[in-house]
Curated annotation (Swiss-Prot):
Hydrolyzes ribosome-free peptidyl-tRNAs (with 1 or more amino acids incorporated), which drop off the ribosome during protein synthesis, or as a result of ribosome stalling. It comes from Histophilus somni (strain 2336). The record marks 95 as: Stabilizes the basic form of H active site to accept a proton. This is Peptidyl-tRNA hydrolase. Belongs to the PTH family. The record marks 12 as: Discriminates between blocked and unblocked aminoacyl-tRNA. Its EC number is 3.1.1.29. It holds the Pfam family Pept_tRNA_hydro. The keyword tRNA-binding applies. GO terms for molecular function: peptidyl-tRNA hydrolase activity; tRNA binding. It comes from the Bacteria. Keywords: Cytoplasm, Hydrolase, RNA-binding, tRNA-binding.
Amino acid sequence: MSEIKLIVGLGNPGDKYADTRHNAGEWLIERLARRFNFNLSVESKFSGKTARAVISGQEMRFLVPTTFMNLSGKAVSALANFYRIPPEQILVLHDELDLPPGIAKLKQGGGHGGHNGLKDIIAQLANNKNFYRLRIGIGHPGDKNLVASYVLNKPSPTDWQLIDRTLDEATDCIEILMKEGITKATNRLNAFKA
């Protein structure tokens, strides 16, 4: 039985950003949509694309904000408040500079680590950091001054192969989360290396 009621995939809107590292969370939502056969549709009151699906008998909501990354919290808080979903039942899928490609980690709580999407979500949830995060490794450019351009560029073919396998594993682990709970999903994903 899933403790999670809302899964959010972070990214930037528009074709210009679709294949960039910062959109890793949205890439994962797209895989979940294929796996569980749901379609996201734009809902302006939530500033995002949303879907509802019943998976393993559990109602689940999905959200991809259509705001830019640094305003992601507007969409998350609007949907969470409307459906009365507390932060502890939210899973945010996002790119992670501090993990190499081929690695993903699932955890609850923590800071924003400089991630502007997480920073805004925390602010819009009244500084509540207790939501879950699925961190998709994209690697680090090695110099903090290069981070902004790095996350807004496409991964190399080698990195993409690792990220692709990681997204497949993360999709499997989210299915485990829905059927068997967060602990089992966390243990499996956190042990994975592409």
